Amino acid sequence: MGPGVGDKSAVQRRKTGRTGLIAVVSALGMTMTLAGCGGDSVSPSDVTLKLVAADYGDSKANSSQKYWDELTKEYESDHPGVKVDVSVYSWTDVDRKVKEMVDAGNAPDMAQIGAYADYAAKGQLYRVDELLSIPVQANFVSQLSDAGQTNNTQYGMPFASSTRLLFYNKTLFSQAGLTPPESWNGLAAAAKVLKSEGVTFPYALPLGPEEAQAETMQWLLSGGGAYTDDVGTYSIDSEQNIKTFTWLKDELVGKGLTGPVAPAKLNRADAFAAFARGEVGMLNGHPSLMQAAAKKGVQFGMVPMPGVNGRAKATMGVADWMMAFKKNGHAEQIGDFLDFVYDDKNVLAFSHHYDLLPVTTSASEAMAADEDDQDLAPFLDQLPASVLYPVGKTSWAGISADIKKQIAKAVTPAGSPTGIFSSLQLTATAADSAS
C-alpha cells in the first residue's frame, strides 16, 4: 500500500498538481478508429461527429461536459474540417438516451456508456480491429480488452476502469486495538469487536438495488467463485458461491454485524455516506470513496479483500465502454478523433480528475511511477488480477437486474442461499441459451 493512502493532503496534492493538465485535455474518451471502409469515405470538410457520453461529475462544476469541450476544441483546432458534437447525460439517462436514438434510426457516431453487447449482437457496431490503429488497440490493459469481446471479437473499448478494496476506519480500528483482517474469520472477529465498541455498521453490506451485483461479485470472488466459470458459462449456483453466501448469512448478517439497516435496504451510496460520517468499520469501496472520506476528515486505510483463508486471489474490476456505430459511416474521421482521445495525456487527465484507473498499459505504467498517484496505487495493483462482469454476454443486463432484486433474500433469516442461487442459475442459463 502506497504512502498517503487515506491522507487528505495526499488526495489534494495530486488533484491540485494536475489542474493545469486537466484544463488542457479533457478525457472522457475511449477510442475507436477505423481505416476507411469503401463507401464510408466522406470529405473531411463535411463531417460532424456525434458523441453521446456519460457524466462522471457530481455537480455542474465537475461535469464531464467541460472535459469534452476542452478536448474537442483542441482536436478541432488541428482538424478544421471536422467538428465533434458531444452531448453528456447523467448515468441515470445516458443508456436510455442512446437506445432511443438507435431505435429511432439516429444512432450517434460514438457512444460512451455502460454496455455494448446488445448493439454488437445486432451488427450495429464496428469491430475494434476495424477502428483503432494497431498501437492504440495493443495498448489496452489485457483484462479490459478481453472483457470488450463478444463471441471472441472485440466491439467494446474500455473507457474508464476501477477496482475494489476493503476500506477500514483507522480511528475505529485503533481504538479497538484491531489490525486489518486478512481472512473471513479475521473480518468477522474484527466486526464483532467493533460492534462491542458501539460502531453502527461494523461491516456495511450494501445488497440494496443500487449495486447489489457488485457487492455480491466481490464476495463471490473472495470465496473462490464468480458469476461464470473459466470458459464463460454461468456458474452462479456453484458450490463455492453458495458456501460464500451461507457464511455471510450465518457469520455476519445473522450475528448482527452488518448494522441496523437490512442489507436489502442498504445501497452503496448510503454505505459510502455512512463511512464518510465515521459510522462504518469496514466496507468494500472504489477510489471515489477516498475523496468523500478525506473531505469529512475520516482517517482510513485500504487492503485487498480478505479471502476464506487469507487474501482473496482475485478482486472485482469494473469498466465503462466506448463504441462506434456503423450507421453514419464517418469511419476514417471517427478513428482519427479517437486515436487522439486515447493519447496518454488525455487518458491520465480523465483518470486523475475522477479518481479512476487508466485503461491503457502505458498510462497505467505512468500512473504507477508517479509519486503523486500513490493514493491510487493499491487499486492499480489489483487490476492485473481483476475479474470483470460478463459484459460480453447479451444476457448479462437482465441477469444483473435479477441479482439486484433477489440476492439480498439469501442472507435474510428465512432465506436460502441454495434456493436463491439455483433460481438465478436457471434464469441465467435460459437467458444465455436464448441470446
Give, region by region, the residue ranges found by the protein language model:
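Conserved N-terminal structural module of periplasmic/extracytoplasmic solute-binding proteins
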Residues: 2-117, 309, 333, 349, ...
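A structural signal for short loop-to-beta-strand junctions that line the ligand-binding cleft
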Residues: 109, 136-172, 312-314, 386-393
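Hinge/lid segment of periplasmic solute-binding proteins
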Residues: 114-163, 215-217, 301, 371
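Glycine-centered hinge/linker elements that transmit conformational signals in sensory
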Residues: 191-193, 197, 233-262
